[in-house]
Swiss-Prot record:
Keywords: Aminoacyl-tRNA synthetase, ATP-binding, Cytoplasm, Ligase, Nucleotide-binding, Protein biosynthesis. Present in outer membrane vesicle formulations which are used as vaccines in human. Transmembrane segments: none annotated. This is Leucine--tRNA ligase. The gene is leuS. ATP binds at residue 637. A motif ('HIGH' region) lies at residues 42-52.
């Protein structure tokens, strides 16, 4: 065995050994329990970042732990390869997105392999490959035929200069990110998935997910947003019907969760796109201008909370069905046309947003809820105004004195008797629009025919292949400019027709990739039925909390769609979910001449610390001049505070990177980058190597201790007790708790005790062998390369075949224990007694200690309290 720890030599050798043995290449095996471990697959952006390293190391630790415990472990890897960044990079570098993507995949795959992950690379999948998205298109056509996928108009951001649709994140302060042009809102036909048909099941099945973080489930519940309320129809006043047709000329419909406050409504507000708004604006330029302003604004619901609330009165009126009050209709920018009815009733006295709006525009506030003796002040909002639980109705005629639920039922009865409303359960969740007016995505398999309408592409003509030799120019959809792509024959009538040139939302690919991994080369369907039956759901899923809503919700939705198509036999895709924290690092900057910030990489900064080790100043190494310490933030390109994993691996080895990532913080918490922490991790691995080296230097490896320990010295018994207590703890830390930092700390403590123990002689050497073999197996999931190498030196066999160490229960039973002695609650000494010592023996031994004699000062004991196995407290 070489004396020095050299990761550059041992890591490739260990990886070759695993690859040659194909230990991570798995197939269905009914003789073993299965374990499907999956970390969210990466977008091939070019290089791995530290967040990737942390994410995939967590999955690898769990996979290797289960492998040693006899499970048939599948840990696949692939690439979430479609998306806008590839198009942006293509325009910047004048290269096709496909070429850019495939180059990145090759480089990142090399990086992943260098980290030694236990990945079954035979299952590798890239979502931009036709053999993958063919089946996505196939499912789309099936669901289109069933009506679960449908087409309707949707609002998009239109850049009039670049002549293209922009994503919300490409709109900056209302202008296109490339052209700088003011963005327009346009209605265009788009395809939608009826996720609302599954809203109730998606909500209820969250209760099945016992091993998901409660925070994630709460976020999904709020996103689905089930509410019980009432539809209310306000009759349109006779003098306000001009320009309106059909039901819009009869009534204005709203949905409210607070029908108990209906008597307090003082106006109603509609979206800019509402027919009543259009009718009112027909001859009013000021209304037309406001409507145009609203349509140019953001369509994102998230922006509604922070944006300034604006409105304009229409001069049109509707009638409150309960009290006959005539309420003016306002056009308001906070009402969204795509949500509900595009209209809301406003009760300023009991809704904070309405209160602020009414205050701004001097609209009336009518109190209809009272809570105790609290006085209503229309000049200042108070929290109790919106109290549903404790309020009772006032100023509401025969409804006065009713609580919320009683009032809800009474209002429902009144409205239903008039045909003016009824109770309704509603969801915040909206159908999922999947059309994207971009190039680098999965083509939507629809043909538009003037005779036959929208026709799904037949299965035998799939996939509709995306041309890969295209370099986008940012000026509209490339596919819409390619007759060779869009010109086709109608599958129904054979006449001239046109392919759909929109592509699918990239969340589509990530909504089912975990099923494709089960049989990635299966050519007769989305997933091989036998493989789907064996692997079932993912046992452990790992990814960031930022995916709590969209990706995880869509993946759950797709699982139910595929189940209903008979493709899989599970209701939920992920049994257990771990949401790892971010990797964060200090940030530094200098202000530039333009008032902006030039961010400086931490590696280029030199710090000065106070006597407590806290940074107090920083200078740039290159010029010695000060830089601003800006605090700790997530590693990112924009803040220039990232650390290249490849540099870390080159300097210290993959095992050091893995160990630091697992030891620096519990997996669900943020991990703060620390150069000293990395160096500390490397020191520990050198120590581990040195410990085994010194042991083998004293003689050849022996058979690890096993059997009765009656003949062992107390010191060796204590070491074995520590060893097996550590094994039990680490097993629990890996399996149930998933807290890897405490597992590492436990092994460090074990090695500390090993260093202090005399392991000379035949028995001592056998116990030493047992300790070192076990420590190496306990650490293999985290630092597999060094452990694989040390195991071969200690044992000569293959570590992955050795199995997880078992706990010797006999070793956990101590013949002697240490008990604290207190006098009047203060520690005055310790005694070593037999583990089964009686209460009387413990009392006698405690009273005889030097500390007890000294501090009792000759006084008799009033009481002696014995806590078995822990302490004796003498009260005088």
């Amino acid at each position: 065995m070489q004396e020095q720890y050299r990761p550059a030599a041992i890591e490739p050798a260990a990886q070759k050994k695993w690859d040659d043995a194909r230990i991570f290449n798995v197939s269905e095996d009914a003789s073993k329990p299965k374990y499907y471990c999956l970390s969210m697959f990466p977008y091939p952006s070019g290089k791995l970042h530290m967040g990737h390293v942390r994410n995939y190391t967590i999955g690898d630790v769990l996979s290797r732990f289960k492998l040693l415990n006899g499970f048939n472990v599948m840990q696949p890897m692939g690439w979430d390869a479609f998306g806008m960044p590839a198009e942006n990079a293509a325009m910047k570098n004048n290269v096709a997105p496909a070429a850019w993507t495939y180059d990145n995949i090759e480089y990142m795959k090399t990086q992943l392999k260098s980290l030694g992950f236990a990945i079954d690379w035979a299952r590798e999948t890239a979502t931009c490959k036709p053999e993958y998205y063919r089946w996505e298109q196939w499912l789309f056509t099936k669901l289109f035929e069933k009506g679960i996928v449908y087409r309707k108009n949707g609002t998009v951001n239109w850049d009039p200069v670049d002549q293209t649709v922009l994503a919300n994140e490409q709109v900056i302060d209302g202008r296109g990110w490339r052209s700088g042009a003011l963005i327009e809102k346009r209605e265009i036909p788009m395809y939608y998935f009826k996720i609302t048909d599954y809203a109730e099941e998606l909500l209820n099945d969250l209760d099945k997910l016992e091993h998901w973080p409660e925070q994630v489930k709460t976020m999904q519940r709020n996103w689905i947003g089930k509410s019980r309320g009432m539809t209310v129809r306000f009759a349109v006043s006779d003098d306000s019907k001009q320009g309106l047709e059909g039901d819009y000329a009869k009534f204005l419909q709203v949905y409210t969760t607070r029908p108990d406050t209906l008597m307090g409504a003082t106006y109603v507000a509609v979206a800019a796109e509402h027919p009543l708004a259009a009718a009112a604006a027909a001859d009013k330029p000021e209304l037309q201008a406001f409507i145009a302003e609203c349509k140019a604004g953001s369509v994102a619901e998230a922006d509604m909370a922070t944006m300034e609330k604006k409105g304009v009165p229409t001069g049109r009126y509707v009638v409150n069905p309960l009290n006959g009050d005539k309420l003016e209709v306002w056009i308001a920018n906070y009402v969204l046309w795509g949500y509900g009815d595009g209209a809301v009733m406003a009760v300023p006295a009991h809704d904070e947003r309405d209160f602020e709006f009414a205050t701004k525009y001097n609209l009336p506030k009518k109190q209809v809820i009272a809570v105790g003796d609290n006085a209503f002040d229309e000049n200042q909002w108070q929290e109790w105004y919106g109290d549903k639980e404790n309020g009772v109705l006032v100023n509401s005629g025969d409804l006065d004195g009713l609580d919320f639920q009683t009032a809800f039922d009474a209002v429902a009865a009144k409205l239903q008797s008039q045909g003016a409303g009824e109770p309704k359960t509603q969801y915040r969740l909206r159908d999922w629009g999947i059309s994207r007016q971009r190039y680098w995505g999965c083509p939507i398999p629809i043909v538009h025919c003037e005779q036959c309408g929208d026709v799904p592409v037949p299965a035998d003509q799939l996939p509709v292949v995306l041309p890969e030799n295209v370099v986008p120019d940012g000026m509209g959809s490339p596919l819409a400019k390619m007759p060779e792509f869009y010109e086709t024959a109608c599958p129904c009538c054979g006449g001239a027709a046109k392919r759909e040139t929109d592509t699918m939302d990239t969340f589509m690919e990530s909504s089912w990739y975990f099923f494709r991994y089960m049989s990635p080369k299966f050519s007769d369907g989305m997933v091989d039925p036998a493989a789907a039956k064996y692997w079932g759901a993912v046992d452990q899923y790992i990814g960031g909390i930022e995916h709590a809503i969209l990706h995880l919700l869509y993946a759950r939705f797709f699982t139910k769609l595929m189940r209903d198509e008979g493709l899989v036999n599970v209701d939920e895709p992920f049994e257990r979910l771990l949401t790892q924290g971010m990797v964060v690092c200090e940030t530094y900057y200098r202000e530039n001449d333009k008032g902006g910030k030039d961010w400086i990489n931490p590696a280029d900064v030199e710090l000065t610390f106070d006597d407590k080790g806290r940074p107090i100043s920083a200078v740039l190494k290159a010029d010695g001049l000060p830089v601003v310490i800006s605090g700790t933030e997530k590693m990112s390109k924009s803040k220039n505070n990232g650390v290249d994993p490849q540099e870390l691996i080159n300097a210290y080895g993959a095992d050091t990177a893995r160990l630091f990532m697992m030891f620096a913080a519990p997996p669900e918490q943020s991990l703060e980058w620390s150069d000293s922490g990395v160096e500390g991790a490397h020191r520990f691995l050198r120590r581990l190597w040195r410990t085994v080296y010194e042991y083998l230097k004293q003689g050849e490896a022996v058979k690890a201790f096993a059997g009765s320990q009656d003949g062992l010295s107390k010191e060796l018994k204590d070491l074995r007790h520590k060893l097996h207590a550590t094994t039990a703890k680490v097993s629990d830390d890996y399996g149930r708790r998933q807290q890897f930092n405490t597992a590492i700390a436990a092994v460090m403590e074990l090695l500390n005790q090993y260093d202090k123990t005399d392991t000379g002689g035949e028995q001592g050497r056998a116990v030493a062998q047992e300790v070192l073999e076990t420590a190496v197996r306990l650490l293999w999931p985290i630092v597999p390369h060094i452990c694989e190498t040390l195991w071969s030196e200690l044992n000569g066999a293959k570590l992955w075949e050795a199995g997880w160490p078992t706990v010797d229960e006999a070793a956990l039973v101590k013949s002697e224990i240490e008990v604290m002695v207190q006098v009047n609650g203060k520690l005055r000494g310790k005694i070593t007694v037999a583990a089964d010592a009686s209460k009387a023996d413990l009392e006698a031994a405690a009273l005889a200690t030097e500390g007890a004699v000294k501090f009792m000062e000759g006084k008799p004991a009033k009481k002696i309290i014995v806590v078995p196995g822990r302490l004796v407290n003498i009260v005088v």
